[in-house]
């Protein structure tokens, strides 16, 4: 019997090549957005990346695009309150949502960002999938549950990407995956497959590229 939320398998050669070609194109930072009025034209499909601060979001985007330093990490949780848009060739926007984990952010800033996030998620017709990044060392935390609930209510399909998988021994990883699967079973918008990655080692990057390349 197959587990609910199985790990994504490595794509076949043709699917992997489609992903490679998409991400072989030029990757560039387009703009940071602080209000809906600043969004770029909805003229191509887009995927967004959400995750708590220090989950490895910038590293993952840099690994996907093969462009070191394209997405820059902030060491202060909640500091960057912009939605950052990157172009991936002429076909795709990669959208970096601000890291959540608000211990050091003023309440007014948090509320403003949450409003913008809700508006973006519910109002962006070209958004094909959200990727929610979960640190393999820690599993799903309360703040992750909050973003998943928001994606449920916004009717945006989201897929969990486990980061830093190389930092966890295989026996411990199985326990964490059980916890993640249990959490995902409560979310109707969760895509029924998990991607295991390590930006440092390159594990799972080709798989994620292929998944993105086959969204339409």
Curated annotation (Swiss-Prot):
Pfam families: MMR_HSR1. One of its GO terms (molecular function) is metal ion binding. Keywords: Cell cycle, Cell division, GTP-binding, Magnesium, Metal-binding, Nucleotide-binding, Septation. InterPro entries: G_ENGB_dom, GTP-bd, GTP-bd_ribosome_bio_YsxC, P-loop_NTPase, Small_GTP-bd. Mg(2+) binds at residues 58, 80. Its cofactor is Mg(2+). Residues 43-216 form the EngB-type G domain. The keyword Kinase does not apply. GTP binds at residues 51-58, 78-82, 96-99, 163-166, 197-199. GO terms for biological process: division septum assembly. One of its GO terms (cellular component) is cytosol. Necessary for normal cell division and for the maintenance of normal septation. Belongs to the TRAFAC class TrmE-Era-EngA-EngB-Septin-like GTPase superfamily. EngB GTPase family. This is Probable GTP-binding protein EngB. It comes from Ruegeria sp. (strain TM1040). The lineage of its organism: Bacteria, Pseudomonadati, Pseudomonadota, Alphaproteobacteria, Rhodobacterales. The gene is engB.
